């Protein structure tokens, strides 16, 4: 039997939509089929749990970035402003999968004190932690009505595997194993709940068919690592003339798509409202490559308005070393080239035509369920920041 022990530390996590949140840190102990464990946990929940929405997200920690969904991709304002609670637990001694390498107690996985030279991993810890949360230990999270799971990239791959393993049976109502580059060979046959997978063009692998409890999506032109302060800090060199691909950064940010799909999944579970149908990139007749338009952009999939109106060629992966380990990480960044200007022969004749088309593309995404209202308005606002520039050119000029 596993136990979420009394928190060793707690602190304010801020106030969101007039609801105060508290972050708890402590030790989770027990035994799986691999042996005993004692690992760090972290829970962020309303100070008065009953005032939240009683839906809790268990995040599998990422090997490099730890709690990537809560901190970077969805964000605290998005989650906690809507009343969700969040929790994570260490399950491996490799990198930040441990969640906290110095929690103030001995970390044990698979019956062994963790040693970086002898990595230990036990994914069963994640599902035991989720099940223990339903018991509302120490009244930290309230009476949970729905339990979700989420992971991105490295942690999305781990969650993919968890969802196919017997120990996860009937654990989660909804899961988001995302941008994991696994493709059809690892397509989960989940033992519990509904599944939503978003993959970027870089991560996209052909899939066959669909199922009532799964939805699969792919973002055209999207790199594995979306635009962020992290990517901009790595790629600071000025563009040259003629303009090469602006390697490492891209205005095709997929974070808004993921937020819309998260809300769609939540409504799927709580209201029975179907999410958008599976939407994938189009393949060549041979089925072994992505179809592209004359500009070189991928066809099909979820299409950012800048890509849909043809502002540039958007590249899902660029061949560029970056000054951080490990070396292969460069493949995870995107870029863009062949940027078009208003008045170009193969583009819009005037600014009014351009803005009208961009706005229509953003509204179409919103109607399809791939953009929230606030993100639709934000995209159109960014396209209008300069009366002679496109969304891509405004991005390139650093206006947003």
Predicted regions and their residues:
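Loop/turn elements at helix/coil->beta-strand transitions in domains of secreted/extracellular proteins
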Residues: 51-56, 82-87, 143-147, 170-174, ...
């Amino acid at each position: 039997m596993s136990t979420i022990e009394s928190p060793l530390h707690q602190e304010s996590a801020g106030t969101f939509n007039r609801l105060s949140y508290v972050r708890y840190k402590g030790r989770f102990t027990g035994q799986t089929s691999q042996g005993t464990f004692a690992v760090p946990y972290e829970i962020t929940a309303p100070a008065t749990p009953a005032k939240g929405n009683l839906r809790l997200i268990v995040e599998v920690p990422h090997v490099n970035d730890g709690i990537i969904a809560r901190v970077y991709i969805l964000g605290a304002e998005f989650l906690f402003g809507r009343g969700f609670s969040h929790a994570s637990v260490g399950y491996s001694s490799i990198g930040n999968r441990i969640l906290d390498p110095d929690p103030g107690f001995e970390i044990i996985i698979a019956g062994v004190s963790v040693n970086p030279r002898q990595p230990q991993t036990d994914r069963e810890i994640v599902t035991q932690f989720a099940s223990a949360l339903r018991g509302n230990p120490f009244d930290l999270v309230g009476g949970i009505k729905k339990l979700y799971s989420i992971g991105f990239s490295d942690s999305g791959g781990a969650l993919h595997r968890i969802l196919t393993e017997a120990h996860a049976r009937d654990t989660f109502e909804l899961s988001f194993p995302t941008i994991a580059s696994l493709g059809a060979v690892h397509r989960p046959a989940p033992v519990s709940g509904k599944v939503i997978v978003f993959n970027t063009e870089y991560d996209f692998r052909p899939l066959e068919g669909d199922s009532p409890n799964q939805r699969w999506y792919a973002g055209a032109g999207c790199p594995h690592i979306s635009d962020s302060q992290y990517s901009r800090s790595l790629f600071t060199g000025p563009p040259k003339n003629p303009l090469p691909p602006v390697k490492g950064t891209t205005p095709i940010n997929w974070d808004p798509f993921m937020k819309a799909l998260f809300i769609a999944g939540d409504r799927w579970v709580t209201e029975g409202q179907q999410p958008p149908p599976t939407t994938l990139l189009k393949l060549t007749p041979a089925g072994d490559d992505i179809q592209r338009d004359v500009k070189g952009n991928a066809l099909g999939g979820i299409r950012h308005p800048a890509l849909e109106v043809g502002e540039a060629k958007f590249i899902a992966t660029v061949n560029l070393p970056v000054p951080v380990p490990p070396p292969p990480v460069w493949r995870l960044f995107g870029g863009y080239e062949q940027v078009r200007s208003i008045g170009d022969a193969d583009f819009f004749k005037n600014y009014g035509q351009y803005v009208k088309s961009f706005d229509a593309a953003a509204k179409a995404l919103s109607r399809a369920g791939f953009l929230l209202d606030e993100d639709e308005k934000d995209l159109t606002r960014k396209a209008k920041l300069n009366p002679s520039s496109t969304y891509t050119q405004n991005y390139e000029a650093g206006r947003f």
